[in-house]
């Protein structure tokens, strides 16, 4: 077994537990760490329940969220797992993406079946782009009637299908987190079965370097005799010297140019990768043709838009947000990547106003186009102060 220590090549995945309050998300998280620790002691340490339950508060863009992070390994993979103690913490985490999830374990108590927060979490998972779900039907030891278990399973599958997840096909594993924590061998096996389902059914996400090149522009300056240089952190993909790129966003027309040189820390590079803070020299571009807030992209891979639907969390007064509600036609700034753009908010029918601390859907019309795709995160600001955070759920124009 000593060999396992040396394996650093395991794929790394981010997952989390979602579901209704008191259905056993935190107990399940603790049970996973315990059972994997018992089976693979040299790979895992057990994290006790109370340590997960008293999750530290984090600030993501000024929003206070309690999140517990645990890590563990199966034979195949290394997992970072997030669990939020409170319902509001989930909503905030999912909308702001404070902890990104490549997949989720939906915990449903067999004794209750799907409850209101089960639905809300699944809806949010769909909207914010959590791509895969595996179901843990928890407290299965407390239901003796096989028919009831089958009915609850059917209900969960229907709920998932209604939100466009493959409800008929995804795995539903019957577990008892509490019994597994107490050391019951049969139910410990159910946790292993659950993790096998996660290993097999939550695929690895594409790596950032495999996605098409995109770099938000942070700064622009001209170097005498050489031309115009733009700097920024490459968000995804790879760019090579002498490749053609498009500059899009903010202005109505795109600009096409060639990257003639790439530098990082004043050293010349042949290519820039996702995560690099790079300076790109652009051929035939004048200083005034580009500005902060635009994006440099692989031609044709992303388009600028002005109108979209979003799921948004509005900061509470305690988090430094607004003290008063806002109404239809609210006009704050929307901060995308590196810049603010003013937009007009349209609230969904039946929503008169939005209070600080609420989450809501909205439609936004920006006064300038921004390079965007579904899932893009933004902050809502008033005079430089963050009052909300959101994600694009659908592009309209």
Curated annotation (Swiss-Prot):
Mg(2+) binds at residue 26. It comes from Planobispora rosea. GO terms for cellular component: cytosol. Belongs to the TRAFAC class translation factor GTPase superfamily. Classic translation factor GTPase family. EF-Tu/EF-1A subfamily. NCBIfam families: EF-Tu (TIGR00485), PRK00049.1 (NF000766), PRK12735.1 (NF009372), PRK12736.1 (NF009373), small_GTP (TIGR00231). Its EC number is 3.6.5.3. Keywords: Cytoplasm, Elongation factor, GTP-binding, Hydrolase, Magnesium, Metal-binding, Nucleotide-binding, Protein biosynthesis. Residues 83-86 are annotated as: G3. Residues 176-178 are annotated as: G5. It is an enzyme of class 3 (hydrolase). Monomer. The keyword Magnesium applies. Residues 62-66 are annotated as: G2. Residues 19-26 are annotated as: G1. It comes from the Bacteria. Pfam families: GTP_EFTU (PF00009), GTP_EFTU_D2 (PF03144), GTP_EFTU_D3 (PF03143). It catalyses: GTP + H2O = GDP + phosphate + H(+). InterPro entries: EF-Tu_GTP-bd, EF-Tu_GTPase, EFTu-like_2, EFTU_2, G_TR_CS, P-loop_NTPase, Small_GTP-bd, T_Tr_GTP-bd_dom. The gene is tuf. This is Elongation factor Tu. GTP hydrolase that promotes the GTP-dependent binding of aminoacyl-tRNA to the A-site of ribosomes during protein biosynthesis. Its main location: cytoplasm. Residues 138-141 are annotated as: G4. Totally resistant to GE2270A and kirromycin, but sensitive to pulvomycin. GTP binds at residues 19-26, 83-87, 138-141. One of its GO terms (molecular function) is GTP binding. Residues 10-206 form the tr-type G domain. The keyword Cell membrane does not apply.
């Amino acid at each position: 077994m000593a060999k396992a220590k040396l394996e650093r090549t395991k794929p790394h995945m981010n997952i989390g537990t979602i579901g209704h309050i008191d259905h056993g998300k935190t107990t399940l998280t603790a049970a996973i760490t315990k059972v994997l620790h018992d089976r693979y002691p040299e790979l895992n340490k057990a994290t006790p329940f109370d340590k997960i339950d008293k999750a530290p508060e984090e600030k993501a863009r000024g929003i206070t969220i309690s999140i517990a992070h645990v890590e563990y390994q199966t034979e195949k993979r290394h997992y970072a797992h997030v669990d939020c103690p409170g319902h509001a913490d989930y909503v905030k985490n999912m909308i702001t993406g404070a902890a990104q999830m490549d997949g989720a374990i939906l915990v449903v108590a067999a004794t209750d079946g799907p409850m209101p927060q089960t639905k809300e979490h699944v809806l949010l998972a769909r909207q914010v782009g959590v791509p895969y779900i595996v179901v843990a039907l928890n407290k299965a030891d407390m239901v003796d009637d096989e028919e009831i278990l089958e009915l609850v399973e059917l209900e969960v599958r229907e709920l998932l299908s209604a939100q466009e997840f493959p409800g008929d096909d995804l795995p539903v594993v019957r577990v008892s987190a509490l019994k597994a924590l107490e050391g019951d061998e049969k139910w410990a096996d159910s946790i292993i079965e659950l993790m096998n389902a996660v290993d097999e059914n939550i695929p690895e996400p594409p790596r950032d370097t495999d996605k098409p090149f995109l770099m938000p522009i942070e700064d622009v300056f001209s170097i005498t005799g050489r031309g115009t240089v733009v700097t920024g952190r490459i968000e995804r993909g790879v760019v090579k010297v002498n490749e053609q790129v498009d500059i899009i966003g903010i202005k109505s027309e795109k600009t096409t140019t060639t990257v003639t040189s790439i530098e990082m820390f004043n050293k010349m590079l042949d290519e820039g990768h996702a995560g690099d803070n790079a300076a790109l020299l652009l051929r035939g571009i004048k200083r005034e043709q580009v500005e902060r807030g635009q994006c440099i992209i692989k031609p044709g891979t992303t388009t600028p838009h002005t109108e979209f639907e979003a799921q948004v969390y509005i900061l509470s007064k305690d988090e430094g947000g607004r003290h008063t509600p806002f109404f239809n036609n609210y006009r704050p700034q929307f901060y995308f990547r590196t810049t603010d753009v003013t937009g007009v908010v349209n609230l969904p029918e039946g929503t008169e106003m939005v209070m600080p601390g609420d989450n809501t859907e909205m439609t936004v019309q920006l006064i300038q186009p921004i390079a965007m795709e579904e899932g893009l995160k933004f902050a809502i600001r008033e005079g430089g102060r963050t009052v909300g955070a959101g994600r694009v759920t659908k592009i309209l124009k």
